[in-house]
Amino acid sequence: MVSRSSEGAEGPPPSAPKPPNTPAKSRLSRLGSSPSKREDKSRDDRMIKSSAKDVAELKDYQLGDCLGKGAFGSVYRALNWNTGETVAVKQIKLADLPKSELRLEIDLLKNLDHPNIVKYQGFVKSAETLNIILEYCENGSLHSIAKNFGRFPENLVGLYMSQVLHGLLYLHEQGVIHRDIKGANILTTKEGLVKLADFGVASRTTGLSESSVVGTPYWMAPEVIELSGATTASDIWSLGCTVIELLEGKPPYYNMQPMPALFRIVNDDHPPLPQGASPAVKDFLMQCFQKDPNLRVSARKLLKHPWIVNARRSDSVVPKSSTEYEEAVRSVQEWNEALRSPSAGTLRRPVKHDQSPIPVPPTRHTPTKDTLPSPVSRNVTDRFRSPVPTEEEEDNWDDDFATAISPSALQLPHLRPHDNFGGMLSSEKLKAFASLDGTMIKSDDSFGDSDSSFGSSRRSDEPDPLETIRPYPLKQPTAESTQLQELPRSQINKTSMASMHHVPILTQNPTPPTKQPRPASYYKENSIEDYSDLIQANEDVLDSKLGAFQEADENVDPFESSPSKEAIRNRASAEDVMGQQPQLRKQISVKRHRSAVEIQRFAENERDEDFSDLLGTDEVMIDQPESDGSSDQSTLMLNSKLSNNSWLGDQDDEDDPFAQLEEGLDEMDLEANIARDKHARLRNQVEGLVSSLKTSQDEDVLAEISEQLLTVFCDFPETKNIIISAHGMLPILEILDMCRRRDITSCLLKIVNAIIYNDYEIQENLCFVGGIPIINEFASKKYPREIRLEAAAFVQQMYQTSTLTLQMFVSAGGLNVLVEFLEDDYEDERDLVLIGVNGIWSVFELQGSTPKNDFCRILSRNSVLDPLSLVLSRVLDEDGELAEIVEGRIANIFFIFSQAENHVKEMVAERTVLHRVLKELRRMTPAHQITMLKFIKNLSMLSTTLDSLQNSNAIDVLTDLLRATMKRPHFREVSNQILNTIYNMCRLNKSRQEDAALNGIVPLLQKIVKTERPLKEFALPILCDMAHSGKVGRRELWRNKGLAFYISLLSDPYWQVTALDAIFTWLQEETAKVEEHLLDHRPDRPSFTDSIVRCLTISKANAFENLLEPLQKLLRLSPPIASTLARPDLFTRIGQKLHHSKAAVRLNLLRIISSICDSSEEQGGLLAKYGLLDAIRELEHDPAILVRDMAGKLIQSNEKSEAYGMGKRKPMVRRRSTSATPPNLLANQSAPSTPQMNRTSQSKAYYEGKEGSRHPRNALSGSALALRPGSRDGSTPSLTAGLNGSTGASRTRLPRGVSNRMSHVDLLSEEDSARPSSSLSRRQSVLHRRRRQTQADADWTP
């Protein structure tokens, strides 16, 4: 309670003053305020002091300076004149608080005694204030220390948390829930002790019921926010938040407003943990942040956590010296000095190592518990430095890059289409001139799972384009060659491998056995191109080098063929070089220096026909078994027929390799020449056109050239490779960038689109040279439709081919182009709009490294959902499969946006968009309707979007949709999303709850609860929250028999606690009406009393504990209802649970017994009647102080009841009144028992004769009813006025002959001013006779 006042201001908390003579603080105060401000402040302090000294009842104390101010009072330093002790006095205005509850709690909690708890020494009550006398903690709160000196180191936080846990453990064992653990409520002393303050009364001094969510939410547990009630586990959650507060300087979610913070606490798995926290601290916090309070660890278990144990081990909790506070402050100062130092980002210092230096990773700002000092420096910051990680812990990023990038990816830049020299003699062209013997094998253009460097590279058994096949003069074979022809092919392969492995390949970076970091130059393309990386060092190499070419592919990839150096030098033709062509073209100035050595080994030399260097020696070949090469296709075939298909070869001929050399040679040459001549002319024409594409050309000439080039390309698509090899893409892009003639632009865009179609490598090349922004420019609305369509086709290729092109397209502003397409008129530019929709959908569908959230953020800046919602409306007007596909894609885009970060959700939650989407919900197909409902549901999970949803009539539309889909097959999926959305919107908001009630949600929910079992769990929370809404919502509940529905829920073990809490809340708001219905017994429905008794009887362990709190509040609020529970079956159940292991359960059971006894005619005699007297007497020796006190008062009540002769009592008379308040409630029982308890027989006879024959109540009756909360609805008759002593329309019923009468005249006069005249006249005489006596009762001190 000491620090409660600190919530109202940023100053130090109440009993947490700043150290008076600290130089640093005085300097800060001098620097932070001007002389005039200091004078004003001192004047204000003097005024506060003077007003505080006016309290005459504080006769034994001299008030000093004000320690802190809050919303409900102020805290002063005070001196006890009798003992000389310094104390803290907290003054609370009675007008703001329920005095009866304060009185009882303080009376009970002042008996608590523990070193880690601020001692309550008593209180003094005046006419206007309640003065609570507390132990004075001279060093202030942990919050003030953190505010003045900075963040705490982990070891100091662990030491403090150990003491806090000891205090919490004591409180929990006494049945007290702190409810407000935070740094401002943890006070420190000079001895280094920390003490808990503001416990037990914290939730009540705010004047709020447990169902209210008001105030600073950052320390609240999820179950408190969800109105499930505070438990001891709630303190553990708050303790975790306090740890973060001390380590970080701020609690979790401090950068948010209260309502968003509440949503994050409930929805997140756990609050964000400090980034620099050690593993031990993070584990401790995760134990505190268990969402389920039943799984959350207790304070006793947390005391055994390694972090707390180590803290206690390093520094004992027992105070050692008076300088411990200064040491703690110095530790905090040194820690924050280390954080602010220039090397704060690199606190880890590398230790000198025998090996190469270890890269130092970025460090955390918070040390681990294993911090080690540096061996070099002994500065103050060294004690907080993290240890240097070992070699095993170091991250080698070079290894990551070495393994993440495949060799095939790195070698791709060496394979370019222009290396194929046009590809004119493709297999399709040559098919007319040559017959193909053998099997066609389809090559794969994509990356596969094989070990080859490139997916489309030749297979090991395919013909090798690097080998030169040429006829030799007929010659008698030598013995060696004859033997070679007789050996299997596999033996030749294996014997030749030894020579292959020793051939040097001139590469800049030979591949080592293990992956090593590669220099940047490795990724650059060399001007001297090399194909040596395609050579595979395995047995199949020679198969491809020396074998006959039986298998040819119709669709051979352009990258398959590359001419050898020897072939280029000896060709006389100007034709293209392809893997399928019969001859090689003339020498071309293309060099292959790096692979020359490797290829030269396979080139034939007229002067050297010895193959021993390739095939090995005879001895090696003899060692090979024949079975290794038994296949016909694997034998060595150099005796190919060079007639029609000589370049293809025939692997079935094994005899003389040159036997039929001259056969059909002239015929083949004639047909091949025709094909070569045709393609040569075509190539020359295309190369000439490309070379004429210059920006200096006249536009008319450019128009003619571009048109001719387009015509040739359309007739012969294979000219694509010629354009690429002639480097035609760059001239085309230059002209597109400079020229603005539409015909030229249109032709060139068509050529570009045809070249890049489904060729990701060419697309990447185009992106690398800056083609995307140039072509994206033509998507603008200022260009004609034809050009825009071509630009749209280019855009489509960019976003749907590969991840790399997509990333480059987005980086070049491509998403803006897609949004611009969406903004076109759907009627006129339907194709462009659909390209935009499909483009955005494809962006999200591609599985790349860029998160979808980033795309959402980029697109949300352009308000993409606004035009997209318009497109949705137009698409829904159409029929057909295409319209349904587009509808589904739009719905998926909306859904993806709702899964993005909160900033994106806030940007897309525009009223116009939401209104349009909600309007079209009814027209969408069921599957897409559910997807769009998920979009709305996800938006409703963010508090900042709820107003936009409400303004878009979301509740109205969703309620109508729920009603319309009740009979449809997809009702369960639709209602699941709708109910979640309505629950998120109506939660903690009365206006939206009333809006939903007015739209008829209550009967729909009741129907769902009765018929749909799985959906019941979604509907019941909304229904139970309706009791917390305003008059409109409760009126709808009355209309639909909501109270009877709540009573029926008491039989459901999973919802009985929520239902009882709803009934109690409704009773608070409309006490008389609800009480009348609860007491109304009808044969056609179960009574409330029977339901309560059955509920307590059948409830399980956890449900039983949670039922007690709202039940005892309800009985305290309504004595007539409490009197109906004086039943043997209920008392039997209570008797079984009186010895429960938890002190809080025992205490609540005793409070329930007290409320029932007080409302009954027999009062304390019920204990003996139902056999609870012995059990309660045993509880007088309970270890929990509060349980002992309550049990003792019940025993006193029983004894007094026996003394007054309970059997002679007259029945209780209920007086008529115009007030809606139940007539047997006490007017005000805020005063404790006074020496005038036992009044004279004459005064007792006077009361009994005038106002009834009831026997006097004991002190317990006043105590029990003093805890009765008031109604929050000021417009309806409530109990607040009577209980708080303020004016109101309520009328209370005084017990006849009550022993503890009204405490002072002020409260009586306030109550009588609110009474009807008849009641007032009957009381005036009594008031005059008892004025002196009530004046003497003004002190609360027992």
Swiss-Prot record:
Keywords: ATP-binding, Cell cycle, Cell division, Coiled coil, Kinase, Magnesium, Metal-binding, Nucleotide-binding, Serine/threonine-protein kinase, Transferase. Residues 369-379, 1218-1244, 1273-1290 have a biased composition (Polar residues). CDD domains: STKc_Cdc7_like (cd06627). Residues 11-22 have a biased composition (Pro residues). GO terms for biological process: cell division. ATP binds at L67, G68, K69, G70, A71, F72, G73, S74, V75, K90. Residues 1-47, 336-396, 441-486, 552-591, 1201-1342 are annotated as: Disordered. The active site is at D180 (proton acceptor). Its cofactor is Mg(2+). GO terms for molecular function: ATP binding; metal ion binding; protein serine kinase activity; protein serine/threonine kinase activity. Residues 1-10, 1315-1324 have a biased composition (Low complexity). Transmembrane segments: none annotated. Residues 658-695 form a coiled coil. Residues 1207-1217 have a biased composition (Basic residues). GO terms for cellular component: cytoplasm. Residues 36-47 have a biased composition (Basic and acidic residues). It catalyses: L-seryl-[protein] + ATP = O-phospho-L-seryl-[protein] + ADP + H(+); L-threonyl-[protein] + ATP = O-phospho-L-threonyl-[protein] + ADP + H(+). Its EC number is 2.7.11.1. Belongs to the protein kinase superfamily. Ser/Thr protein kinase family. CDC7 subfamily. This is Cytokinesis protein sepH.
